[in-house]
């Protein structure tokens, strides 16, 4: 995300004012949600976005390691390395991370959705989930192309194994399904093992 894009987004972030007795306090909407242990991933995943999500996860663990964190996801995916940084942090912290898909979770975002705590992964009824193999390309000397191709294959295998671990699907099925864009409805994602429940209202 460029500085210019961030400034444009910041212009549209609502400010919430809370009154407590004689005092008023203003928060941007995401800071207010953080008070309720809600982290919102609502953009393509890059290093900037990943660092923000990771910082929030670490902060909430420090606040209370025994309480769940709620990660809402509406993202088309993005950088694999940035996404894996979020994934590793989700597994690293002591808190259970409940994942909730609103809108879409595609590519790396689908991996994060599946990586939530077992029994605490949700999708709203009209959410769309998509898995596929990592995208990449190479040009230049043949040796460089070979090196990049080898790394892409390593990352592809890594992501497939992560999906297999969290969905319970055999690695062979994951490899076949991620060979091309594989779209799922919320119910299909539940059957696949990416989410545990489709929810339409708060319980």
Swiss-Prot record:
Active site: 107, 132
Chief site of localization: cytoplasm
Reactions performed catalytically: Hydrolysis of proteins to small peptides in the presence of ATP and magnesium. alpha-casein is the usual test substrate. In the absence of ATP, only oligopeptides shorter than five residues are hydrolyzed (such as succinyl-Leu-Tyr-|-NHMec, and Leu-Tyr-Leu-|-Tyr-Trp, in which cleavage of the -Tyr-|-Leu- and -Tyr-|-Trp bonds also occurs)
Listed PANTHER family: ATP-DEPENDENT CLP PROTEASE PROTEOLYTIC SUBUNIT (PTHR10381:SF70)
Species in which this protein is naturally found: Thermotoga maritima (strain ATCC 43589 / DSM 3109 / JCM 10099 / NBRC 100826 / MSB8)
Enzyme Commission designation: 3.4.21.92
Protein name: ATP-dependent Clp protease proteolytic subunit
Subcellular location per the Swiss-Prot or TrEMBL entry: Cytoplasm
Family membership: Belongs to the peptidase S14 family.
Function, as annotated: Cleaves peptides in various proteins in a process that requires ATP hydrolysis. Has a chymotrypsin-like activity. Plays a major role in the degradation of misfolded proteins.
Gene Ontology CC, one term: endopeptidase Clp complex
Gene3D superfamilies per UniProt: 2-enoyl-CoA Hydratase, Chain A, domain 1
Pfam family, one: CLP_protease
Keywords assigned by UniProt, alphabetized: Cytoplasm, Hydrolase, Protease, Serine protease
HAMAP family reported for this sequence: ClpP
Zinc among keywords: no
GO biological process, one term: protein quality control for misfolded or incompletely synthesized proteins
Gene Ontology molecular functions: ATP-dependent peptidase activity; ATPase binding; serine-type endopeptidase activity
Oligomeric and partner information: Fourteen ClpP subunits assemble into 2 heptameric rings which stack back to back to give a disk-like structure with a central cavity, resembling the structure of eukaryotic proteasomes.
SUPFAM superfamilies per record: ClpP/crotonase
Primary enzyme class: hydrolase
Highest taxon above the source species: Bacteria
InterPro entries reported for this sequence: ClpP, ClpP/crotonase-like_dom_sf, ClpP/TepA, ClpP_His_AS, ClpP_Ser_AS
């Amino acid at each position: 995300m460029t500085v210019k894009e961030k400034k444009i987004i910041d212009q549209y972030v609502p400010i919430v004012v809370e009154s407590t007795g004689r005092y008023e306090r203003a928060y941007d909407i995401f800071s207010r949600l953080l008070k309720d242990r809600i982290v919102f991933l609502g953009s393509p995943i890059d290093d900037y976005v990943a660092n923000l999500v990771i910082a929030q996860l670490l902060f909430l663990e420090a606040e209370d390691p025994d309480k769940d964190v709620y990660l809402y996801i509406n993202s088309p995916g993005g950088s694999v390395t940035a996404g894996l940084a979020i994934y590793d942090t989700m597994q690293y912290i002591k808190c259970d991370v409940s994942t909730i898909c609103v809108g879409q979770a595609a590519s790396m975002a689908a991996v994060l959705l599946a990586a939530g705590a077992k029994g605490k992964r949700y999708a709203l009824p009209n959410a769309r989930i998509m898995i596929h193999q990592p995208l990449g390309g190479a040009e230049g000397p043949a040796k460089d192309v070979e090196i990049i191709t080898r790394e892409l294959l390593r990352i592809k295998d890594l992501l497939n194994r992560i999906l297999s671990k969290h969905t319970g699907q055999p690695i062979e099925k994951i490899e076949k399904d991620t060979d091309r864009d594989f779209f799922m409805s919320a119910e299909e994602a539940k059957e696949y093992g990416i989410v545990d429940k489709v929810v339409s209202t708060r319980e």
